[in-house]
Amino acid sequence: MINTYVEITEKDINPLDLINRVRRPDAGAIVTFEGTVRNDSDGVRVTALYYEAYKEMAEMQIADLIDEAKKKYNILDAAVCHRIGLVGLTEDSVVISVSSAHRSSAFEACRYIIDTIKERVPIWKRDILENGNGSWH
């Protein structure tokens, strides 16, 4: 049975917590993705990102896409945590951990989850620029 863990939070994310949530004896692989805030967006200096979300809907949609990934890639467990609010340079904005019997399934499912979050889930980000301006994505 899959242990779906989804959280949208204003708190710092502890990647090890997500890894431990998907660790199990029948897993031969755990893949973890950390999306971090970088200092550049299309050649413009960024000092932070600001995230907003329709929290309840976002958590429900992420849980649904984890279920899709389970069926499509035969994963064992998955855990996703996404930040909202102000996220500074080098901080994690999203962490995804996936366990499966074999590494290829874990890698493919992890990529599917992050790509689908960016496409479908109601989470929006605003670049906080060095010049004081910003833009929503």
Curated annotation (Swiss-Prot):
InterPro entries: MoaE_sf, Mopterin_biosynth_MoaE
Record-level GO BP terms: Mo-molybdopterin cofactor biosynthetic process
Catalysis: reaction(s): 2 [molybdopterin-synthase sulfur-carrier protein]-C-terminal-Gly-aminoethanethioate + cyclic pyranopterin phosphate + H2O = molybdopterin + 2 [molybdopterin-synthase sulfur-carrier protein]-C-terminal Gly-Gly + 2 H(+)
UniProt cross-references to CDD domains, sorted A to Z: MoaE
Known pathway: Cofactor biosynthesis; molybdopterin biosynthesis
Keywords tagged on the record: Molybdenum cofactor biosynthesis, Transferase
Binding residues for substrate: 36-38, 102-103, 118, 125-127
Purpose of the protein: Converts molybdopterin precursor Z into molybdopterin. This requires the incorporation of two sulfur atoms into precursor Z to generate a dithiolene group. The sulfur is provided by MoaD.
Family: Belongs to the MoaE family.
Subunit structure: Heterotetramer of 2 MoaD subunits and 2 MoaE subunits. Also stable as homodimer. The enzyme changes between these two forms during catalysis.
PANTHER family xref list: MOLYBDOPTERIN SYNTHASE RELATED
Name of the molecule in the record: Molybdopterin synthase catalytic subunit
Protein species of origin: Thermoplasma volcanium (strain ATCC 51530 / DSM 4299 / JCM 9571 / NBRC 15438 / GSS1)
